[in-house]
């Protein structure tokens, strides 16, 4: 299936390209939206091509405001049977411990609220913290999370603009992968700007007659 034709998105001084190759599956994913988390990071969310027909069945015809305010819409993005990739690029320096402990705090809250937090999730959290233990993220460096529908979370690091071809670690826990993404774009996610960008971009794509024609999409942002 071809990727929908989308433009790059510009957030502050950072540019997210229209498509990237996942380090988990090596599939090409399209840029669904991008925004920032206050002054700390900028976030780009990429989706597998099949995401568009998958969400269109229920959400085609909705405008950006309706999607932005819809908890079920973002739950479908988080839990849908298609690959998702989130690229988190640093605006200020953070250590791996600083970053991972805050992410874990948010993810544990999400998983416990769902009533599905078990020993498997606790073990996955420990693995997640270990991956970040000795890392340092200067401004411009990125963390890539590839969430595969079969239940794995691939984590990769990059000091450059490109997404690495392979991940540093793979954690096989479906709930953790979903919680990481939900902590960014869910109802109480850290980046309302990314949530809004996804809603605007996907609404335009779903409501176009031919989302694969590059003339149909011309959306940029300076969130």
UniProtKB/Swiss-Prot annotation:
Disulfide bonds: none
Enzyme class: isomerase
GO biological process, one term: flavonoid biosynthetic process
Catalysed reaction equations from the record: a chalcone = a flavanone
EC number: 5.5.1.6
Record keywords, A-Z: Flavonoid biosynthesis, Isomerase
InterPro entries reported for this sequence: CFI, Chalcone_isomerase, Chalcone_isomerase_3-sand, Chalcone_isomerase_bundle_sf, Chalcone_isomerase_sf
GO MF, any single term: chalcone isomerase activity
SUPFAM superfamilies membership: Chalcone isomerase (SSF54626)
Annotated site residues (Important for catalytic activity) in this chain: 99
Residue stretches spanning the membrane: none
Pfam families named among the record's database cross-references: Chalcone (PF02431)
Pathway where this protein functions: Secondary metabolite biosynthesis; flavonoid biosynthesis
UniProt-annotated binding residues for substrate: 41, 106, 183
Domain of life per record: Eukaryota
Miscellaneous comment as given in the Swiss-Prot or TrEMBL entry: Part of the biosynthetic pathway for all classes of flavonoids, a large class of secondary plant metabolites, many of which are brightly colored.
Record family assignment: Belongs to the chalcone isomerase family.
Function: Catalyzes the intramolecular cyclization of bicyclic chalcones into tricyclic (S)-flavanones. Responsible for the isomerization of 4,2',4',6'-tetrahydroxychalcone (also termed chalcone) into naringenin.
Record protein name field: Chalcone--flavanone isomerase 2
Species of origin: Arabidopsis thaliana (Mouse-ear cress)
Source species taxonomy: Eukaryota, Viridiplantae, Streptophyta, Embryophyta, Tracheophyta
């Amino acid at each position: 299936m071809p990727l929908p034709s989308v433009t790059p998105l510009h957030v502050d001084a950072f540019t997210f390209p229209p498509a990237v190759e996942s380090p988990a599956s090596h599939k090409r994913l399209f840029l669904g939206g991008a925004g920032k988390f206050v002054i700390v990071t900028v976030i780009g969310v990429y989706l597998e091509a099949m995401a568009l027909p998958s969400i269109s069945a229920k959400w085609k015809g909705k405008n950006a405001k309706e999607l932005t305010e819809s908890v079920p819409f973002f739950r479908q993005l988080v839990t849908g049977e298609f690959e998702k990739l989130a690229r988190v690029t640093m605006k200020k320096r953070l250590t791996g411990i600083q970053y991972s402990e805050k992410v874990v705090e948010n993810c544990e809250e999400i998983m416990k609220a769902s009533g599905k937090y078990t020993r498997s999730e606790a073990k996955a959290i420990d693995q997640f913290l270990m991956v970040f233990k000795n890392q340092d993220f200067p401004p411009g460096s990125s963390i890539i999370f590839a969430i595969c529908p079969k239940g794995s979370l691939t984590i990769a690091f990059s000091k450059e603009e490109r997404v690495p071809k392979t991940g540093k670690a793979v954690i096989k826990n479906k709930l953790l992968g979903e919680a990481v993404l939900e902590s960014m774009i869910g109802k109480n996610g850290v980046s309302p700007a990314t949530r809004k960008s996804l809603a605007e971009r996907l609404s335009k794509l779903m409501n176009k007659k031919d989302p694969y024609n590059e003339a149909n999409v011309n959306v940029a942002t300076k969130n």
